[in-house]
Amino acid sequence: MSVDEFRFIVEKIRPFTSYIYLHVLGEPLLHPHLDEILSVAESNGLNINITTNGSLLQQKKEILLKHKIRQINISLHDAEENISSDKWSDYLKTALEFATIMAPTTYICLRLWNSTNENSVSFNVQCLKEITSAFNLSKEELSKETTGNGLKLAEHIFLQRSPRFEWPDKDQSGEQTRKTCYALRDHIAILSDGQVVPCCLDADANMKLGDIFTEDLADILETKKAIDIKKGFEQRKVVEPICATCGFSTLL
């Protein structure tokens, strides 16, 4: 998505929201025009939220520091699968140092979404060790059960632990036909090619509602498909088969 395309989208969505979340699937800090993208969002008065795997925090630190960003979510669990174990400590130290630097003006959510995965034990032990050291916390304090925003580590810094969930998969059959979801209730997603979908997990546009570049957002949200999906979730009913395969609703 180019900067001009992003600017066009911001103009289209601005009457509907004051919040923007720069993620669907992929790493937002990889965008070659990140600085300009953030400037456009900021100049339009949008509350900027970013979800990142944390691998580029050091490289992009100066860009992130110069902008007013409401919240940055750092998916620590991603490092377990994508970084060799001998580099976990360096990765975690960088992420925690970045969190401390940004915290005066930005909320930082450290995500550890793998709490039920037995294979993640050693990685999680390493994470909690680094966190207790960085924030001078005891193991007992770190093991407290929390909900919502998670455990407060310091001012504006939180640790959020959740089970790993299954992403929706159109090639699988699902039996969870009664569930609710945030889709179309408090958010939609717009993919890099302009396709509008109900939620941030539909990265392949399996439930395409429209195209932001050729249609008005108000018209897209009033399509029969969008209305049926939203009403379905309000009644805890799955309308789209792919939603029956999604595990995120178990976290709601």
Regions found by a protein language model. Name each.
Residues I101-I108, S133-Q176, L201-L251:
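C-terminal accessory region of radical SAM enzymes
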Residues L34, C199-C200:
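Active-site-flanking alpha-helical
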Residues Y182-L184:
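Short, small/polar residue-rich loop motifs at catalytic or cofactor-binding pockets
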Residues I190-L191:
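Short, acidic, Ser/Thr-enriched surface-loop or helix-capping motifs
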Residues H187:
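Short hydrophobic/aromatic beta-strand element in the GNAT-like acyltransferase core
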